[in-house]
Structures are given as C-alpha cells and as structure tokens.
Amino acid sequence: MIGCRLEPPQGRTQSVHLSPAETKLTTLGKAAAQEQAKHPELSGLYLLSDPREAFAARGELAKRAEKALDVQYYIWHGDTTVSLLLETLYEAAERGVRVRMLIDDHGTSGLDEAFSAMDAHPNIEVRLFNPFVFRPFKLFGFVTEFDRANR
C-alpha cells in the first residue's frame, strides 16, 4: 500500500485503465454501447441520489465486472458498508478482475491492516490520496500538514 506520490512497489507492474476499445469487449461495455447508439444525444449519466440505491448499484457493477474496477472514495470508514464493499471487491479480484482503489487517507484510522491485506492480493492495488506519513498518529499529521492534507 502506497501513497499516490510514491513510486510503485518493486515487482509489480504499473497498471493503466482499460482503453475504450477494451471496455467495449465486456458484457457491460456492449450493453452501454447499445444504449448509447439508441440515444446519442444523451450523456449516459444517471444520478443516484438515494444512498441505498447507489450502494446497490456499485455492488451490482462490481459483481458483473469482467476486466477491471476502478473505485475512488473520499469518505471511507470501517463500517458495515465498507465491509460489504471490500468483500465484493475481493470476490471480483478472485475472479481475475483487476481492482484499483484510490482512497483519501483522511478518516481511514484503523484501516491500515485491511488496506494492506487487500493490497497484498495480486489483482488489487490500494492507493492513498493525501497519505499521512506518520501512520499511528494521523491527527498529528493532519495538524502539522494542514494545507497539504486539505487540498
């Protein structure tokens, strides 16, 4: 597990996102392309304002992923929702899906072991945005690096 400003660990290849051509070869990509062809004037974005609906949609997309999952979270706490999401992401990685996680380090106290365990999986990459260098006392880093930690 590394912060975004550090080099990737030795022995691990640098990953990149899927190209649009690769995305169109997946089941979800084909379905999205068909809908886009039917409605070229629309963006394809749909706002999920209900948190339960949004969580269910993320879980379902993760369960159907075939090639890659890129997840980015600003608020990440060690609660039931996070446990369920981590389980779903782990199951995807076990199916051979490449999972890349970008998590804001603010508010992740007590989760270093879970993130390290996930990052140890060959198909999972965990990256921390705004990482606190002094891990045991993140509050100290938050106070001494206020400008950087709040960008």
Regions found by a protein language model. Give the residues of each.
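HKD-type phospholipase D/PLD-like phosphodiesterase module
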Residues: Q14-S15, E22, T27, Q34-A68, ...
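Aromatic-capped interface at the extracytoplasmic side
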Residues: E7-T13
